[in-house]
From Swiss-Prot:
This is ATP synthase subunit b, chloroplastic. The chain crosses the membrane at residues 26-44. The lineage of its organism: Eukaryota, Viridiplantae, Streptophyta, Charophyceae, Charales. It comes from Chara vulgaris. F-type ATPases have 2 components, F(1) - the catalytic core - and F(0) - the membrane proton channel. F(1) has five subunits: alpha(3), beta(3), gamma(1), delta(1), epsilon(1). F(0) has four main subunits: a(1), b(1), b'(1) and c(10-14). The alpha and beta chains form an alternating ring which encloses part of the gamma chain. F(1) is attached to F(0) by a central stalk formed by the gamma and epsilon chains, while a peripheral stalk is formed by the delta, b and b' chains. The keyword Membrane applies. Belongs to the ATPase B chain family. PANTHER family: ATP SYNTHASE SUBUNIT B, CHLOROPLASTIC. One of its GO terms (cellular component) is proton-transporting ATP synthase complex. Keywords: ATP synthesis, CF(0), Chloroplast, Hydrogen ion transport, Ion transport, Membrane, Plastid, Thylakoid, Transmembrane, Transmembrane helix, Transport. It is found in: Plastid, Chloroplast thylakoid membrane. The keyword Ribonucleoprotein does not apply. Pfam families: ATP-synt_B (PF00430).
């Protein structure tokens, strides 16, 4: 049976040789094994680790550059937005001032137009009143003249006799001939 043990574990024949080998159990490793493992890792893994670290470094640097570029872009956009905001505020203030000025101008124009229209209406009213007064006066004159003429006719008809009519006709004929002779002598 001891041969079976030697076949299964060849190190058991050599007691000193049984202690040489890699012990991968971290708790049981000794300093030499750690040195060998670390040395092997440093020798063979140096390039791999260096490449990984360089790639990681490039990724980080690119990320930083991108972040700085985005920061600069954002800063520039913020500055542009602030400039645009200032322009908009200035324009809004300018529009507000122009609006106030325009309102004052239009207010004065409306007051002037209302005053002018009021004066024009007053003049039109006065003209209409004057024309109505003239029309009424003319109508009163006609009425008075008509009444006076009717009264005169009534008086004349009452006083006018045939003798008086003959005397008046003779008087008018004499007056006409006298005027006619004066105008022919000239």
């Amino acid at each position: 049976m001891s041969e079976i043990i030697h076949v299964i574990n060849p190190m058991s024949k050599w007691p000193l040789a049984s202690q040489f080998g890699f012990n991968l159990d971290i708790l049981e490793t000794n300093l030499i094994n750690l040195g060998v493992v670390i040395g092997t890792l440093l020798y063979f893994g140096n390039e791999v680790i260096s490449n990984l670290l360089n790639k990681r470094k490039e990724i980080i640097l690119n990320s930083i550059r991108d972040a700085e570029q985005r920061y600069e872009d954002a800063t520039e956009k913020l500055k542009q937005a602030n400039r645009d905001l200032e322009k908009a505020k200035f324009k809004a203030n300018e529009i507000r001032i122009q609006g106030s000025t325009q309102i004052e101008i239009e207010k004065k124009e409306l007051i002037y137009a209302a005053d002018r229209d009021s004066k024009h209406l007053e003049e039109s009213k006065n003209i209409a009143i004057h024309l109505e007064e003239q029309r009424i006066l003319e109508e009163v004159r006609r009425e008075v003249s008509g009444l006076a003429f009717q009264k005169t006719l009534i008086i004349l008809n009452n006083r006018l006799t045939s003798q008086l009519q003959v005397e008046m006709i003779d008087y008018k004929i004499d007056l006409f001939f006298n005027n006619f002779q004066v105008s022919t002598n000239l």
